[in-house]
């Protein structure tokens, strides 16, 4: 019996036994090598470590799940394997990849698996912030070292900046001189434009065209900034801050040579020549135009070379005092190196080097001021331009609608199409003077051109014996979208009246009617529309119905009131008021008239509960009136008890007069009258002494007396 050892095992080390089929071998047969059974169809990717079928791209290489997990555990747990005893050259296969872990980890690293790609789990925020700060500081130090190496070489820095300016700028001295000579020889002046230099006739351009005209120029400034040594070492935020703040300044320095002071004009980007006086001064732009030409004349008088312009543009862009910068130290170093290069070039080309450099650097505040003013003007121009384009689109849409309506009318009326085709033009109110003037000029031109055609048409029709009158479409009304529309005009409808040039085919009568219609005053449609609607509407309710609706109680109280009135009507023995005998009220006592029960209709009191209650209540009286009423009632009771059967004689004092009629009706009525002295000073009643009451006579038969209501 023979033990088969692994081919890569060493002496003295016991390994696991081989499979059963290879464990006992006859002395005749030799030992077989292990076979790999992997189906390979031409698209299968194998593991770079063990040769097994790869499951994906893990930690930088194609590997299987076993090698991926082995490498992750080894790195995360920081396992130190025992060194290999076979010269660290073990063969790592699928069937024996677990035998030597040291060589397996070594092969994983050798084929390209990255230690940094392994995640270590959740990192605390403080630890993560510390790691990021350390990484940023190390990156910043590396950038500073590289920038120092680039900026310390002065001649190389100077050459790179000048070459970048010549490669990215289209307006060098030679090219601008050729453009200026061509513009002077064959001047092509642009139309009057808004106060936006270097851009002719912006009112005829869209915002997209205006942006495309400056796109390549702005792109040149951005490319120039990227070619400055040390600019690529800045962060994205610092790059954006520098370009946003200094882009227009550098662009203005590049285009300063386009201003021609002797001719008092400017060469536009399209090669046209624009006079200074042709620039409109709207929106307080005259100060901007004058300041721009003055600054351009000042800069052009210095006669800067291309190298000086390139270095000056770099200094304008790389400025350390821009708000929002993070790496200010690197920007300051770049600015100082660029300034020293400019000083070197000025010293080589000019005799007065320091004074000229000082004069050139003094222009930076004025340049920033002009840049700010120009940016504000561009914002205003953009707003006005959008409004102008919107108005133009509105006019075009209105024209298309009128054209469609005219075509429909002509299709309906073949006779009217002959005469009204010339009078289908409409007049529109424009919100801007420029647009109004343009449209007015266009109408005048069309009207002048159509006079001859109209005259020929009239002559031809008159020769043939035809009289054609224009067919005018009826006025159109715009009906309000209302769910309760009653068909009543509200007074807000606007008549869409077609106004056009007078047609040559119209008869004298129709022309007179048109003139009379034009002279007729048109009332404003928006003058008190609610009042007009109310006056035009017919009355919906009469007064009684309106009052019933206004004082209509809730539905649950209506049934209660109906029941109450039905019970009151059905109650037996209800007293009916008797006819009142004539009485003689005194003219000086209107506050105490004789009262009688008021018949109130059931439906009215039921529907007007509050009103009926207020009418049935007695009026509120002052204390003096209450006292007087009590005295009157006392005298009334005395009169009833002490009055004779036939009548009551009038007393000398005459305060009360009792009339008793001889009517056979059993219900006598007592009329009271208070005599008021006709003297100037009223005499009060003396109630201190009580007169002895007479002996009571036999009581008369009891009669009904209606209740007295106080006045």
Curated annotation (Swiss-Prot):
Residues of the NR LBD domain: 153-400
Gene Ontology biological-process annotations: cell differentiation; hormone-mediated signaling pathway; negative regulation of transcription by RNA polymerase II; positive regulation of transcription by RNA polymerase II
Compositional bias per record (Basic and acidic residues), positions renumbered to this chain: 511-521, 560-572
Pro residues: bias regions: 574-590, 693-711
Pfam families: Hormone_recep (PF00104), zf-C4 (PF00105)
Keywords annotated in UniProt: DNA-binding, Metal-binding, Nucleus, Receptor, Transcription, Transcription regulation, Zinc, Zinc-finger
Residue spans of biased composition, Low complexity class: 591-602, 682-692
Similarity field: Belongs to the nuclear hormone receptor family. NR1 subfamily.
Function according to Swiss-Prot or TrEMBL: Orphan receptor possibly involved in the regulation of genes in the ecdysteroid cascade.
Name used for this protein in its record: Ecdysone-inducible protein E75
